[in-house]
């Protein structure tokens, strides 16, 4: 699938215009996008990064990393996904960067999601749903998620997010109404961010292949 990821990432370069500040996500597919962006880095003003990992890779390519507080809204955000449904709703957060990813997506006029074909699903939920949680609320949130959804929350106990929080991965879900579930989980005290991108889905999904498909 690495070739499909690369092809999707390189297709996303078509959406980058001269003088842009580009929002950049996190993950293995985005790494290919950053590498491709490095070839045209002289054409853009810089990037806003969703993780320390992506920041380091951008700087390796000589791309200036800017603070979202100073840039205002962005024209373009490019990121991957763990799952994508036919409505371009996503599960994200396998790399534990979901909160910053959601912030940048919200601040961007256009969200381009780059995936390999294995990420396309008819219904979200086979991939465990990440939920970023304040550490002291971990058990409380897990109990409430279990009661609300029937899914099984599992603490990703070797991981802290870049924000210093923990991640619960919710297994055994079949998410037929992603917008409603995103809204409900966000109401639980202690939840920082839910890895459902449904209220603000992708505007365009690029599926890697020969040739890439644009949805």
From Swiss-Prot:
It catalyses: aldehydo-D-ribose 5-phosphate = D-ribulose 5-phosphate. Its EC number is 5.3.1.6. It is an enzyme of class 5 (isomerase). SUPFAM superfamilies: D-ribose-5-phosphate isomerase (RpiA), lid domain, NagB/RpiA/CoA transferase-like. Gene3D superfamilies: 3.30.70.260, 3.40.50.1360. It holds the Pfam family Rib_5-P_isom_A. The active site is at residue 101. InterPro entries: NagB/RpiA_transferase-like, Ribose5P_isomerase_typA_subgr, Ribose5P_isomerase_type_A. GO terms for cellular component: cytosol. One of its GO terms (biological process) is D-ribose metabolic process. It comes from the Bacteria. One of its GO terms (molecular function) is ribose-5-phosphate isomerase activity. Keywords: Isomerase. The keyword Isomerase applies. Substrate binds at residues 26-29, 79-82, 92-95, 119. Pathway: Carbohydrate degradation; pentose phosphate pathway; D-ribose 5-phosphate from D-ribulose 5-phosphate (non-oxidative stage): step 1/1. Homodimer. PANTHER family: RIBOSE-5-PHOSPHATE ISOMERASE (PTHR11934:SF0). Belongs to the ribose 5-phosphate isomerase family. NCBIfam families: PRK00702.1, rpiA. Catalyzes the reversible conversion of ribose-5-phosphate to ribulose 5-phosphate. This is Ribose-5-phosphate isomerase A. It comes from Xanthomonas oryzae pv. oryzae (strain KACC10331 / KXO85).
């Amino acid at each position: 699938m690495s070739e499909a990821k690369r092809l999707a990432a390189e297709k996303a370069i078509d959406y980058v215009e001269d003088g842009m500040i580009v929002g950049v996500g996190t993950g293995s597919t985005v790494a290919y996008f950053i590498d491709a962006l490095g070839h045209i880095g002289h054409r853009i003003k810089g990037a806003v990064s969703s993780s320390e990992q992506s920041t380091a890779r951008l700087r390796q390519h000589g791309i200036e990393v800017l603070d979202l507080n100073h840039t205002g809204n962005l024209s373009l955000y490019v990121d991957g996904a763990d799952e994508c449904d036919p409505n371009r709703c996503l599960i994200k957060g396998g790399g534990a960067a979901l909160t910053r990813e959601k912030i940048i997506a919200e601040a961007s006029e256009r969200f381009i999601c780059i995936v390999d074909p294995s990420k396309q699903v008819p219904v979200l939920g086979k991939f465990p749903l990440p939920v970023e949680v304040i550490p002291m609320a971990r058990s409380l949130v897990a109990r409430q998620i279990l009661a609300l959804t029937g899914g099984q929350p599992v603490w990703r106990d070797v991981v802290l997010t870049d924000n210093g929080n923990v991640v619960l991965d919710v297994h055994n879900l079949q998410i037929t109404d992603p917008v409603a579930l995103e809204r409900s989980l966000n109401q639980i005290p202690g939840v920082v961010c839910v890895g459902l991108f449904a209220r603000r889905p992708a505007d365009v999904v690029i599926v890697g292949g020969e040739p890439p498909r644009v949805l």
